[in-house]
């Protein structure tokens, strides 16, 4: 029976499969099998025993139901796996889990789950990057009003908006490469990290296990891999979520009825409200913003998991059972929703232009001030004069440039040609070059495989 929305509502089947019980059990069995193979290579156990253990360390032989049955009796999840695997291996079962402590298996298996999950996240980030890159190129010259403090500021372009997000997604992709080096690690170090239970060949055993599984050995551990590693992982997931939250929030705001410059896609048969038939609510981007709040909240317990008693206690375990699958599945949902939204983003060019001129050239106050300073008026004096003229234009509902034309002090410095040149479309500075620089950088990273 599904209870949590990640079981049935959020995330892809691909990501949910990573964290479902059967796959988690399989990863534990994979680690046990790799340990047996390492022992056999070093002559610690018979090769035939390693072969049998490896062959039967899968969920076709070791049933989840049997593991749960044993755990209900002995109240120890990993020992339940060990007993269930030993049962199906017959006389070879005595070599299962040789030298290991529970978290040798758990933490190494977690690294395998995280590796699978991060591969999905990376794929989605790269697909999102491609979508944003095309949007930045397509709208490099789409001039719109920039807003600061929710108020009209000066012109920018939609190319700038998309390139800003593109650059941030690229940083996440680069962060992910660095993160893998620290997160995709396992351990075979025993109860307190000294590896005493593995004897003289402890390092060789660990090296063989990690090479077999495609992981790196942690440099030092106590009973567990230190949870600063997981905290960094959780912060990365939350940081990606914050970028998606930022993008979704901007689209939601730009879809407001009074603005309506862009809109998330709306299906032909889609219903916006149960009582208001006309509604086109931004439910996809609202969902992204909502799920981000859960991702943010999961960072705190990850930080609290780092300080544990002595060589470890168990307070981290129950937390990680919740926050790891939940965070990966929810981020997976957010990434896939944002890909869909951006692919189908609707633009309303007439509204973009209307909003650009909505303030009757008040947004030209900055270039007007700079033009006066260029013509010989002191910069501070020009600022105060334009401020007064802008406030007058605002109060009287008049065009700023018309007010300027009737001001003797301003017109001592300005010509009609100066005023004619003050058009929003002309005041975007180096926007095109900035967007091109971002796109060029991203394309270079793509060529490098980053």
Swiss-Prot record:
Active site: 149 (proton donor/acceptor), 273 (proton donor/acceptor)
Pathway: Purine metabolism; AMP biosynthesis via de novo pathway; AMP from IMP: step 2/2; Purine metabolism; IMP biosynthesis via de novo pathway; 5-amino-1-(5-phospho-D-ribosyl)imidazole-4-carboxamide from 5-amino-1-(5-phospho-D-ribosyl)imidazole-4-carboxylate: step 2/2
GO (cellular component) term, any one: cytosol
Claim: Plastid is one of the keywords in the record: no
Keywords: Lyase, Purine biosynthesis
GO biological process terms held by the UniProt record: 'de novo' AMP biosynthetic process; 'de novo' IMP biosynthetic process
GO function terms (MF aspect): (S)-2-(5-amino-1-(5-phospho-D-ribosyl)imidazole-4-carboxamido) succinate lyase (fumarate-forming) activity; N6-(1,2-dicarboxyethyl)AMP AMP-lyase (fumarate-forming) activity
UniProt-recorded name of the protein: Adenylosuccinate lyase
Lineage of producing organism: Archaea, Methanobacteriati, Methanobacteriota, Thermococci, Thermococcales
Gene: purB
């Amino acid at each position: 029976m599904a209870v949590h929305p990640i079981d049935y509502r959020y995330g892809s089947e691909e990501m949910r499969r990573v964290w479902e019980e059967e796959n988690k059990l399989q990863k534990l069995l994979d680690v046990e099998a790799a340990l047996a193979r390492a022992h056999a290579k070093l002559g610690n156990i018979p090769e035939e025993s390693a072969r049998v253990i490896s062959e039967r360390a899968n969920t076709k032989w070791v049933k989840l139901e049997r593991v749960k049955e044993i755990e209900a009796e002995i109240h120890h999840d990993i020992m339940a796996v060990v007993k269930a695997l030993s049962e199906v291996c017959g006389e070879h079962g005595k070599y299962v889990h040789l030298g290991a402590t529970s978290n040798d298996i758990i933490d190494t298996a977690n690294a395998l789950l995280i590796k699978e999950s991060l591969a999905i996240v990376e794929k989605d980030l790269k697909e999102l990057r491609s979508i944003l890159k095309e949007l930045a190129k397509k709208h490099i010259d789409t001039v719109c009003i920039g807003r600061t403090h929710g108020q009209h500021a000066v012109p920018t372009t939609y190319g700038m908006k998309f390139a800003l997000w593109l650059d941030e997604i690229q940083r996440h992709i680069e962060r992910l490469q660095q993160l893998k080096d620290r997160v995709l690690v396992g351990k075979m170090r025993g109860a307190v990290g000294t590896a005493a239970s593995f004897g003289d060949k402890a390092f060789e055993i660990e090296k063989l296990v990690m090479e077999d599984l495609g992981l790196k050995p942690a440099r030092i551990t106590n009973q567990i891999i230190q949870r600063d590693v997981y905290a960094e992982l959780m912060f990365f997931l939350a940081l990606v979520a914050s970028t998606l939250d930022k993008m979704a929030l901007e689209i939601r705001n730009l879809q407001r009825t009074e603005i309506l410059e862009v809109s998330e896609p709306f299906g032909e048969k889609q219903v916006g409200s149960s009582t208001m038939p006309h509604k086109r609510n931004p439910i996809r981007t609202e969902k992204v913003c909502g799920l981000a709040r859960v991702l943010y909240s999961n960072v705190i317990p990850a930080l609290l998991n780092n300080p544990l008693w002595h060589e470890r206690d168990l307070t981290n375990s129950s937390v990680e059972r919740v926050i790891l699958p939940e965070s990966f599945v929810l981020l997976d949902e957010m990434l896939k929703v944002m890909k869909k939204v951006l692919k189908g983003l609707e633009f309303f060019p007439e509204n973009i232009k209307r909003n650009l001129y909505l303030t009757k050239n008040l947004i030209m106050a900055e270039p007007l001030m700079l033009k006066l300073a260029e013509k010989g008026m002191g910069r501070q004096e020009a600022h105060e004069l334009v401020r007064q003229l802008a406030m007058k234009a605002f109060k009287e509902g008049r065009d700023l440039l018309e007010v300027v034309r009737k001001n003797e002090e301003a017109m001592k410095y300005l010509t009609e040609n100066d005023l004619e040149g003050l058009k929003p479309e002309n005041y975007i500075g180096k926007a095109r070059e900035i967007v091109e620089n971002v796109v060029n950088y991203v394309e270079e990273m793509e060529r490098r495989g980053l």
